[in-house]
C-alpha cells in the first residue's frame, strides 16, 4: 500500500539502492525507506542492526539475542545511506567441497547465505548455471531473494561446455551428441541461444557473461581438437566467439547495450595484455580484471589498462583459491583486499566486484570488510573497520586485543618472495594452506631423493613457470628451495 506523507516530512533519497531510517516525531512514526526493492530491504536490515542489535553475521557467529522489554529509538533518528559506490557487488561460492553437502541438511542452511549477502548490503551472486531444461536452483534462489545473477569466468550465456552433452540429451533429445569442435559453429550457437532464451524467459535479473574457455578452468585449446596452435590464431577464435555471443545476447535481451561482462582470467589476461584479444566494447560492457593468478594482486593487464577505453571496470579477487591458495584457513585479509580495490579504482571507477568466497564460513570476516569498502571507499579504512568488527562481535572490553589478534594472524603468513609490484605492496605473495599441503605432499613423495627444486608446476598449461609456489630462495637467505 502507498503511504501518503506530508511533503514537509519527506526526506529525499539518492539513487539506486539508497535508503534511510528516520523518525517523524510529530506523526510518531518510524520510516524504513528505500529507493527501490533492494534499498527497502537494506533499510529493514539497517533498522534490525541498529536498534535490534542483530549483526549481519548473526548466524555464522552463533549470536544469541538479548531480551529487550523496550526498544528506544531517538526522535532525532535519521540514518541515511547514499547509493553504493560500486554498482554490482558479488560473491562467488567456488570449490564448495564443505558447503555443498551442508546446505542439504536444512532449508535454512541452503538459504542463509542469501540473507547474509543482503544484510551486508551486497546485491549479486555468481550462480548462473542452467538445469537443462530451465534455470538452476541457484538462479531460482537469487530470484526469490531479489539478488542479481552473474556468472563464473568460464561461463558463456549462463552455461559451460561441461553442459554440452546435457543440453543435447535432455533438451534436444538426440541419441548422438554432436562433436564439440570449432567447425561445429552452428551447434555452438544453438547452445548459447538456448541459454539466452531460457534466462530471458525466467525473469531473473541477470548480468550476461561472454567467454570462450574449456569445459573447466582451462583454455579452450585444451578441449577443442581443432584448436589452432599459435597464440595469435587462438586469440582470433576468442575474438570471433565473444562477438557472436554478444550478438546473441542483444537479440534475446532486445537491448542495444545490455549489461555484459567478460573476465580476463589466466590465459585471457595474457592475451589481452598482448593486444591479441580485443573484447567487444561499449558503455555497458564490463571488462572484469583479475588478480595475478595464485597470488592476489592487480595483474599486468589492469596495470596497463587505458582508462579512456569506453567500457565499465570490474575486478575479481580470490579470498579463497583451492588448488594452491587459502582454502581451509583465511589468508588474504582486509588490508590486502583494500590495497587491491583501491589500486583498481584508481584506474577507473569500479562498477562490478566479485570475491571468490569458497565455502563461505572461513571468509566471512574479509567478505564483510569487502562489502563495507564497496559501498563507500571514502568512509572505509581496514584498521578502523577491524576494530569496529571486534566491538560488534566481541564487545568493547576486548575489542583492542581481538583487533590486534586478527591483524597479527594475517601478517604471520610466510612471504616467500620479495614484492615486485610497482610502487611496492605488503604481502604480495604469501604461502597459504594449500601451498603448504602441496609442498609437503611433493616432498613426502620423494623424501629420500634430493632436488634443488622439488616443487613442480601443477598443469601442463601453467602459463607462468614457477608461479604455483613462487619461492625465491635468495629472498630467504637460501640457495635452493
Where are these regions (language model features)?
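Conserved, mostly hydrophobic/aromatic
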Residues: 36, 121, 285, 344, ...
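Active-site clefts of carbohydrate-active enzymes
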Residues: 216-222, 309-334
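Contiguous, structured surface segment used for ligand recognition
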Residues: 1-82
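Gly/Pro-rich turn-and-neighbor structural signature
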Residues: 66-73, 136-144, 177-309, 411-433, ...
Amino acid at each position: 500500500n502507498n503511504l501518503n506523507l506530508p511533503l514537509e516530512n519527506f526526506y529525499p533519497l539518492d539513487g539506486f539502492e539508497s535508503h534511510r531510517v528516520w523518525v517523524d516525531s510529530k506523526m510518531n512514526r518510524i520510516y524504513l525507506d528505500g529507493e527501490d526493492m533492494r534499498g527497502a530491504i537494506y533499510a529493514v536490515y539497517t533498522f534490525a542492526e541498529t536498534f535490534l542489535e542483530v549483526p549481519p553475521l548473526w548466524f555464522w557467529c552463533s549470536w544469541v539475542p538479548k531480551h529487550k522489554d523496550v526498544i528506544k529509538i531517538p526522535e532525532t533518528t535519521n540514518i541515511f545511506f547514499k547509493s553504493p559506490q560500486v554498482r554490482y557487488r558479488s560473491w562467488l561460492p567456488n570449490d564448495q567441497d564443505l558447503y555443498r553437502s551442508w546446505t542439504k541438511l536444512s532449508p535454512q542452511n541452503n538459504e542463509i547465505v542469501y540473507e547474509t549477502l543482503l544484510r551486508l548490503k551486497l546485491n549479486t551472486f555468481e550462480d548462473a548455471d542452467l538445469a537443462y531444461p530451465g534455470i538452476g536452483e541457484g538462479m531460482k534462489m537469487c530470484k526469490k531473494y531479489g539478488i542479481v545473477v552473474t556468472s563464473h569466468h568460464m561461463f558463456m550465456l549462463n552455461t559451460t561446455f561441461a553442459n554440452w552433452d546435457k543440453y543435447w540429451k535432455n533438451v534436444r533429445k538426440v541419441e548422438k551428441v554432436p562433436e564439440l569442435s570449432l567447425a561445429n559453429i552452428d551447434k555452438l550457437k544453438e547452445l548459447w541461444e538456448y541459454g539466452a532464451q531460457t534466462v530471458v524467459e525466467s525473469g531473473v535479473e541477470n548480468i550476461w557473461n561472454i567467454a570462450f574457455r574449456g569445459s573447466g578452468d582451462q583454455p579452450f585449446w585444451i578441449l577443442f581438437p581443432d584448436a589452432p596452435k599459435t597464440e595469435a590464431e587462438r586469440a582470433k577464435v576468442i575474438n570471433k566467439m565473444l562477438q557472436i555471443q554478444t550478438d546473441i545476447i542483444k537479440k534475446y535481451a532486445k537491448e542495444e547495450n545490455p549489461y555484459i561482462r567478460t573476465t580476463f582470467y589466466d590465459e585471457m589476461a595474457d592475451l589481452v595484455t598482448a593486444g591479441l584479444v580485443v573484447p567487444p566494447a561499449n558503455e555497458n560492457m564490463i571488462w572484469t580484471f583479475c588478480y595475478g593468478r595464485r597470488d592476489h594482486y592487480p595483474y599486468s593487464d589492469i596495470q596497463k589498462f587505458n582508462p579512456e577505453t569506453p567500457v565499465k571496470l570490474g575486478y575479481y579477487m580470490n579470498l579463497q583459491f583451492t588448488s594452491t591458495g587459502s582454502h581451509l584457513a583465511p589468508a588474504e585479509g582486509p588490508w590486502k583486499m583494500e590495497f587491491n580495490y583501491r589500486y583498481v579504482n584508481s584506474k577507473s571507477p569500479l562498477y562490478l566486484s566479485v570475491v571468490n568466497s569458497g565455502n563461505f564460513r572461513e571468509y566471512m570476516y574479509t567478505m564483510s570488510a569487502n562489502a563495507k569498502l564497496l559501498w563507500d571507499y571514502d568512509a572505509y579504512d581496514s584498521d578502523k573497520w577491524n576494530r569496529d568488527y571486534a566491538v560488534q562481535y566481541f564487545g568493547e572490553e576486548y575489542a583492542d586485543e581481538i583487533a590486534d589478534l586478527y591483524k597479527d594472524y594475517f601478517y604471520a603468513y610466510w612471504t616467500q618472495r620479495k614484492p615486485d609490484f610497482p610502487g611496492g605492496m605488503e604481502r604480495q605473495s604469501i604461502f597459504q594452506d594449500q601451498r603448504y599441503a602441496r609442498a609437503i605432499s611433493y616432498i613426502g613423495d620423494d623424501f629420500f631423493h634430493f632436488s634443488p627444486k622439488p616443487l613442480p608446476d601443477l598443469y601442463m598449461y601453467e602459463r607462468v613457470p614457477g608461479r604455483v609456489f613462487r619461492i625465491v630462495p635468495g629472498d630467504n637467505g637460501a640457495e635452493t628451495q
